[in-house]
């Protein structure tokens, strides 16, 4: 009986010893990003990095300079606004300007697919004012209220010639905020 108990205890100790072995290996790196701002509002995370889908259009729509696609709305949300710090907010966009019409964003060359030609992307504010992508053309000021504020914009394709060619028609722009 005593031998059986010792054998059972020894077996249990061996199982416990093998089950407690742990290996420590490198798992990777996590990069945390953020920013503290001394401003009237903070830009909502979803607004800081967004995709505006302009859609798919036939090339024959752009058979004259200035022809446009449908306006596609998008917003920039501001959080934790304090109108005592600043009463108004405005936005300016910056990106590669179209070579023919510098009021438009240039269509970026695509490495894996064909790039569309004959159009650029026009950005407008909530008053339909065109926002040149130069980082200096600010939207109309919007009065800030305490808390959350939503700034409204729209974008569309605009013809730069008398014809367009099919392909990807993408562009990137950054934006800056001005508080007054």
From Swiss-Prot:
One example of a Gene Ontology biological process annotation: cell adhesion involved in single-species biofilm formation
Could you tell me the superkingdom of the organism this chain comes from? Answer: Bacteria
Please describe what happens when the gene is knocked out. Answer: Deletion of the operon under classical laboratory conditions does not result in any major effect on E.coli capacity to form biofilms compared with the wild-type strain.
Q: What are the protein's UniProt keywords?
A: Disulfide bond, Fimbrium, Signal
> Where found?
Fimbrium
Q: Which factors induce or repress this protein, as stated in its UniProt record?
A: Expression is negatively regulated by H-NS and subjected to cAMP receptor protein (CRP)-mediated catabolite repression.
Q: What is its main location?
A: other
Name of protein: Uncharacterized fimbrial-like protein SfmA
Other remarks on this protein: The operon is cryptic under classical laboratory conditions, but is functional when constitutively expressed.
Annotated signal sequence range: 1-22
Family, similarity comment: Belongs to the fimbrial protein family.
Please give the GO cellular component terms listed in this UniProt entry: pilus
Name the gene that codes for it. sfmA
Question: Does the entry annotate any disulfide bonds, and if so which pairs?
Answer: 41-81
Role according to the record: Part of the sfmACDHF fimbrial operon. Could contribute to adhesion to various surfaces in specific environmental niches. Increases adhesion to eukaryotic T24 bladder epithelial cells in the absence of fim genes.
């Amino acid at each position: 009986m005593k031998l059986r108990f010792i054998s059972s205890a020894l077996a249990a100790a061996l199982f416990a010893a093998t089950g407690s072995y742990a290996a420590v290996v490198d798992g990777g790196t996590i990069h945390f990003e953020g920013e503290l701002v001394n401003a009237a509002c903070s830009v909502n995370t979803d607004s800081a990095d967004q995709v505006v889908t302009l859609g798919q259009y036939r090339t024959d729509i752009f058979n004259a300079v200035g022809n446009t696609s449908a306006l596609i709305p998008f917003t920039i949300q501001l959080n934790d606004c304090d109108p005592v710090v600043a009463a108004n907010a405005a936005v300016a966009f910056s990106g590669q300007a179209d070579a023919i019409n510098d009021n438009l964003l240039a269509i970026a060359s695509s490495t894996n697919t064909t790039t569309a030609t004959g159009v650029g992307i026009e950005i407008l504010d909530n008053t339909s004012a065109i926002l040149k992508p130069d980082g200096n053309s600010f939207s109309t000021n919007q009065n800030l209220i305490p808390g959350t504020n939503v700034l409204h914009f729209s974008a569309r394709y605009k013809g730069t010639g008398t014809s367009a060619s099919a392909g990807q028609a993408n562009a990137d722009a950054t934006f800056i905020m001005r508080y007054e």
